[in-house]
Regions:
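C-terminal lid/capping helical subdomain adjacent to the catalytic/cofactor pocket in oxidative enzymes
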Residues: 85-160
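Active-site lid/adjacent beta-loop-alpha segment flanking the redox-cofactor pocket in flavoenzymes
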Residues: 1-87
Length: 160
């Protein structure tokens, strides 16, 4: 919901999980992923108040609950599904926390990349492809390459 800069989903136990769309009005914090504070901040209340605009019965509890964590993202917000410079090591990274919805196709992509390498084909030279059965097209996996050029016309978000 870009009007309130939040996304949410129900959680077990009559709870709701709320995330931020990282609006420009919020203070941005660059953190060291190996050394950062994962305690709640005043941003927790801001997110709860924003979500309460959509769910008035939500109310604002005085007991903070949930998780504070980081997620990985690439420069253009498109994931990397590719081999690495370490032989036999493949990557599915930079998913910006949204690719759980694409898990079946991500598995198909990774399977194709690994099979391509097992057949002694170099994905950097002759890119792997997968068949998209429902629409009858092939998908060239260079779009997800670690070596791809950043698309300057990207939305640089998961919102399209």
């Amino acid at each position: 919901d870009s009007d309130i800069a939040c996304y949410s989903r129900p959680e077990v136990g009559n709870h709701i999980l709320i995330g931020s769309e990282d609006p420009e009005c919020d203070i941005r914090h660059e953190v060291d992923p190996d050394n950062w504070d994962n305690n709640f901040s005043e941003q927790w209340t801001t997110q709860a108040m924003r979500q309460a605009q959509r769910i008035p019965s939500l109310g604002i509890t005085s007991k903070m609950r949930g998780a504070v964590d980081l997620y990985d993202v690439t420069e253009d917000w498109a994931p990397i599904y590719d081999k690495s410079s370490i032989h036999g090591y493949f990557m599915a990274i930079g998913t910006s926390g949204n690719q759980f919805k694409n898990a079946p196709v991500a598995g198909k992509i990774m399977s194709a990349l690994i099979s391509h390498a097992d057949a002694k084909k170099d994905h950097d030279v002759a890119p792997a492809q997968i068949k998209l059965d429902r629409i009858g097209h092939n998908l060239d996996l260079t779009h997800f390459s670690r070596l791809r050029n950043i698309n300057p016309d990207s939305s640089f978000s998961v919102l399209g």
